[in-house]
């Protein structure tokens, strides 16, 4: 379908850009770009860190054994549903008040919402908190892409966006590994608290980048 129905106009870059190019070492705003790559990783890590423990954790919250798998599915889906609902709205808001500001607020909100997830007493409380966390995280991907587009020379946008996607896949890889390790060695509630600390550290880093950008 994509091959037959979509026609793309290819614009060759100017000769000067093609000849000169821009290497990673000469990339302007390298710190900002690295921060965005790490933020994309954190987004996936936050969503996937509970995957290894979710069924076992829900079992401690749900008395009816026949409902465990269903509630665990709701928990995993809730964050994605929240992100679907909020992504467009947060992207528009970021265009008005600043992408780095939204990223900082989103990471802070998600990090704080992870703390009560460690102390819930029912499966539906966990579903609600994961949904709210998804609402917060929904603005990250459009904001990350926008920051990269604004800070990277035209000839490198595709390359850096490729790194961004790779970082997100790395988060999908690291998240379950971290969740399984922490859950197995420390405890399931510690998974939520550890993920919270990581997201809040990411929020602090983005806030620092935002302050530095504002003073320039």
Where are these regions (language model features)?
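Structural signature of the two symmetry-related core transmembrane helices
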Residues: 101-116, 193-196
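Intracellular juxtamembrane helix-capping segments at the cytosolic ends
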Residues: 139-152
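C-terminal membrane-cytosol helix-exit motif in multi-pass small-molecule transporters
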Residues: 1-14, 202-210
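Helix-to-loop junctions at the C-terminal end of transmembrane segments
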Residues: 85-98, 183
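Juxtamembrane intracellular "pre-TM" segments in multi-pass secondary transporters
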Residues: 8-36
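Paired small-residue
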Residues: 113, 124-132
């Amino acid at each position: 379908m994509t091959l037959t129905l979509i026609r793309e106009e290819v614009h060759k870059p100017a000769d000067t850009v093609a000849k000169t190019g821009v290497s990673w070492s000469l990339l302007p705003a390298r710190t900002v770009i690295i921060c965005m790559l790490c933020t994309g990783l954190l987004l996936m890590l936050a969503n996937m860190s509970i995957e290894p423990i979710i069924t076992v954790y829900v079992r401690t919250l749900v008395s009816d054994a026949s409902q465990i798998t269903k509630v665990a599915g709701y928990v995993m889906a809730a964050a994605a549903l929240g992100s679907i609902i909020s992504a467009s709205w947060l992207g528009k808001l970021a265009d008005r008040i600043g992408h780095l500001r939204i990223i900082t607020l989103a990471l802070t909100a998600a990090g704080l919402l992870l703390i009560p997830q460690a102390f819930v007493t029912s499966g539906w409380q966990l579903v609600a908190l994961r949904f709210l966390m998804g609402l917060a995280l929904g603005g990250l991907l459009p904001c990350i892409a926008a920051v990269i587009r604004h800070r990277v020379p035209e000839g490198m946008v595709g390359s850096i966006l490729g790194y961004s996607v790779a970082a997100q896949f790395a988060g999908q890889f690291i998240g379950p590994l971290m969740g399984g390790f922490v859950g197995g060695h420390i405890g399931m509630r510690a998974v939520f608290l550890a993920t919270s600390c990581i997201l809040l550290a990411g929020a602090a880093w983005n806030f620092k980048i935002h302050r530095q950008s504002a003073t320039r």
